[in-house]
Amino acid sequence: MFKRTALILRRCFQPTFIRPHHINVLENFKEADDLPNQGQAKFVDVSIHDPQHIRSALVSPMQRKFLQDLEQQQTVRIKWFKEGNQDELENMKNECRRLALEIIMAAKGGDIKKACKELAEKEKCKQIELKKKCKELEKKTKCAKKDPCKKKDPCKKKDPCKKKDPCKKKDPCKKKDPCKKKDPCKKKDPCKKKGGDLKKKCKKLAEKEKCKKLAKKEKMKKLQKKCKKMAQKEKCKKMAKKDKCKKK
């Protein structure tokens, strides 16, 4: 029950267990939280001076056992400070707090309920802070890490009703870059000349040729009709001559 308490109780106890002594134990909780930094090489003097004199004054065997545990934990504490095992030290602090509360409750001294409530509130506050930090880290990791294998949906189609703005105009204030050089290897489009677009001209010429062909066809048809009429007239004349000759 009284093991691992050297981190909190840095001073020797009074010869007998009395109520003011247990109240002083609660004051030492605050000092236990103020641990030295890892970079500091100095260690707190936790040695128990003249333990034989104190043991002779203590009558209870539980008190003697408590001092023996302090002597044993003195060497362990120094080793932990040298090695820098902070996680184990924090676990030791929590256990020592629990043991000190048990000592106070056993001695029936001090306001136990208030001390228990304060410790419970501190632990709750620490847990709430840890949860907040964890949530913030999760959000940061989600934003930082995106799925590289995620691709766009190939089945996603463009809106067919979406049209370009026909009134979109060029910037009249936009100027050409004087330092920009022309590409000497770039060839001009033969269909684009100063005289205009050749494609349009070709279309016009083709239409004209079609019109000419149609006109020729119409002329030929008219000539054919005339020729037929002339041939019929000649036939009629010949027939009339033959009839006259027969009558004579």
Swiss-Prot record:
Region (Disordered) residue spans: 146-200
Keywords assigned: Coiled coil, Mitochondrion, Nucleus, Repeat
Annotated region (8 X 6 AA tandem repeat of D-P-C-K-K-K), positions in chain: 147-194
Sequence repeats: 147-152, 153-158, 159-164, 165-170, 171-176, 177-182, 183-188, 189-194
Tissue: Expression limited to post-meiotic male germ cells. Expressed in elongated spermatids during individualization and in finally elongated nuclei of spermatids. After completion of nuclear shaping it is no longer expressed in the sperm heads with the onset of individualization.
GO annotation terms (biological process): sperm individualization; spermatogenesis
UniProt keyword Nuclease present: no
GO cellular component: axoneme; mitochondrial derivative; mitochondrion; motile cilium; nucleus
Record's keyword annotation contains Ligase: no
Cellular compartments annotated: Nucleus; Mitochondrion
Coiled coil: 82-147, 197-244
Function: May be involved in the final steps of mitochondrial differentiation within the flagellum.
Listed name of the protein: Sperm-specific protein Don juan
